[in-house]
Regions:
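Glycine-rich phosphate-binding loop of ATP-grasp-fold ATP-dependent ligases
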Residues: 19, 139-163
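A structure-centric signal for secondary-structure junctions around beta-strands
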Residues: 2, 119, 136-137, 150
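Basic phosphate/pyrophosphate-binding loop/patch that engages nucleotide-derived ligands
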Residues: 111-119
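Anionic group-transfer/hydrolysis microenvironments
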Residues: 70-73, 123, 145, 157
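Flexible, glycine/proline-enriched loop segments at strand-loop-helix junctions
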Residues: 95-99, 122-125, 150-160
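Short, surface-exposed amphipathic charged segments that create phosphate/polyanion-binding patches used
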Residues: 110, 135-138
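ATP-binding N-terminal substructure of ATP-dependent carboxylate-amine bond-forming enzymes
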Residues: 1-97, 101-103, 107, 114, ...
């Protein structure tokens, strides 16, 4: 009997299209003689197709394991992992807490540094605050604290207006 793998793709984040590409690669790489792949697409507006995964034990009898290929908010941030925990469904990847912590770049850098891992110099910019230039000079890479897949990254060669 084949293992029934639900691959979650799409989602409501700005990384929807990236998720679709990731899921396509995952599904193409799975051995069809061992796995029955069931694609679950979450639209940009949040509608599930073919149907939602129900957050209750035994509410998803046709799924053996879930492979979340979602990116960003509601995908990598612990949200969908929490839903899968409530649904009592095994899934691939990190759990709720690990997913949540790793989505926050500032927190993750602090955790890594506290554990003795090398971390490049950085500074946190908060909207509405006026800051001086970084002590480590230019160029710098600017990245949103809670997005993944390189979304929103820019390389600044000259000091931008700090906002």
């Amino acid at each position: 009997m084949k293992l029934r793998v639900a691959v979650l793709q799409g989602g409501r984040s700005g990384e929807h299209e990236i998720s679709l590409r990731s899921a396509k690669s995952i599904m193409e790489a799975m051995d069809a003689s061992r796995y029955e792949v069931i694609p679950y697409t979450i639209g940009k507006e949040g509608k599930w197709s073919p149907r939602p995964i129900l957050p209750e034990p035994d509410g998803n009898p046709d799924i053996d394991v879930v492979f979340p290929a979602l990116h960003g908010t509601f995908g990598e941030d612990g949200t969908v992992q929490g839903l899968l925990e409530l649904a009592d469904l095994p899934y691939v990847g990190a759990g709720v807490l690990s997913s949540s912590l790793s989505m926050d770049k500032e927190l993750m850098k602090r955790i890594c540094r506290e554990r003795g891992l090398p971390v490049v110099e950085y500074m946190i910019l908060h909207r509405g605050l006026t800051l001086g230039p970084p002590s480590f000079g230019f160029p710098v890479f600017v990245k949103p604290a809670n997005l993944g897949s390189s979304v929103g990254i820019s390389k600044e060669r000259l000091p931008p207006r700090w906002r």
